[in-house]
Amino acid sequence: VTEVHRYTGFAALAASAPEDALYTACEANETAWAMAVRLEGFAPAEYRSIQDLRQLSEAERSPRRLEIAAAAAHHGLRFFADDELVSVGSGRGCKVWAVHSLPDPSTIDWEHVHDIPVALITGTNGKTTTVRMLSAIAAAAGLMAGNTSTDGVQLGGDMILEGDYTGGEGARVLLRDARVDIAFLEVARGGMLRRGLPVETADAAYVTNIGTDHLGEYGIDTLDRLAEVKLLVAKATAAAGTLVLNGDDARLAPALSAKRSVAVLVDPQELPAHGFVRHRGRLGPVNDSRFVAWLEQADIPATLGGAAVHNIYNALGAMAVAVQLGIERGAVVEGLSTFASDSHTNPGRCNLFDLCGLRVIVDYAHNPEGLEVILQTVAALRPQRTLVVIGQAGDRDDASIDALADTCVAHAPDYVIVKTMEKYSRGRDATEVSQRILQRLRDGGLPDEHLASAPDEIAAVHDALEWGREGDLLLLLSQADRNAVLQLLESLRATAWQPGSALPCERTEGLK
């Protein structure tokens, strides 16, 4: 199969190939493009010769690998392969071999190979928090849970790999670990577009929401197209799994017509026939239009007493997925009510610090929708004054940067510090994005005396803490130096630092 997808300003060529010829096919694709470019009179980039492609094909060829893949499919089991390892089954039921010592499929003890429950979590915002809520629920059920996220691969309470592992590599590492009883995989847009789904089958999948982030990349330039990408997880649940969707998201609601789909809703005007909802401040399932309250929103620390509505959605999604995976009510309630969502269990995701009356929230919000929900949370907490530290990476287009600034303006904070994110400039001048945000804030009506800039995140946080007083709330949008920011705040809380007093660090330093 060969397909051409045309987008604004570019095109993508896709071709199918056997399992043991995919890398060669990709290189052949590049070579074909380079030759076409040369025929048009342009100088192509470096590419492989036909002889190189033949050698690559021979090196990649592995009939035994294909035989094992076919046998795994016959037994209804997951199959993973990469440059070094081949495996069948998953978690505690996994068998793994080096690519150069693959067994005859007939010699594999298939009775002792099995799969573990796997859920996929995707969407624009809320993915990482949801997989961590699910891991807490599974732990309460006595299961060894593993998860992948933008922070790494986590098993139980231990981070076994650090970095962005929201693609296939993280899934393979986790699902080849024989200690894992159940797995929750954060699935990012980029990974799906580059490599596809990390697993072919999943027992459940949850799509949190659709928002304006990374538009313009890989030909995805509208929210409807982005929704199509996020809903690719439905392919993994099509055979026997359950698709959980945010039913309040207009771009996801139509997909609820699919078989075995479940909606999560916050304060619906009418109870659905089935689903998981917040109703009168309580969370629980709805069956045959009858609501059963499992716990109060105030009993879920991540919701900050109900102020953090986005975490109510995350909790409902986690609840729905857990139930689909067969986890009992008691474990769901215990997991959600004991998940602190603090700087240790969920770093950088709506972490609230109380510094002797000065409240500080550290959050990863980096798109307009994420900023909107965290600013709504701030408003619900009713501070005397509000300060926002804001910045953005350089790979967002101008419209997305402007929208982030406009969202901030709409909530009329008392003070805004715009940070420069030099190591995330990604092709722009170091201060280009911060200067654009500052100007957009001015254009939106924020006076100069309510605005400031800082050369980096640490300096911005230092200035924010010097500004804050008892009764205020500081919203620190932290990406570049999150760990240092959290360490500083933990130290200030532990030493009962008083707002208005000297800080234990210089403006350009982290914690001493």
Which residues does each predicted region cover?
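A short helix->loop->beta-strand "cap" motif at the edges of active sites that frequently abuts
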Residues: T237-T242, K259-V262, P413, D448-E449
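Flexible active-site lid/hinge loop adjacent to a nucleotide/diphosphate
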Residues: L155-S257
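Walker A (P-loop) phosphate-binding motif
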Residues: T107-D151
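Preference for protein termini
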Residues: V1-P117
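Residue-level signal for inorganic ion chemistry
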Residues: A72, T148, E186, T208, ...
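Adenine nucleotide phosphate-binding catalytic loops in nucleotide-utilizing enzymes
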Residues: I220-A227, L231, R260-E372
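A short, gly/pro- and small-residue-rich
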Residues: V199-I210, R225-L231, V262-P268, L438-Q439, ...
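ATP-dependent carboxylate-amine ligase
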Residues: A308, A320-G330, E334-K512
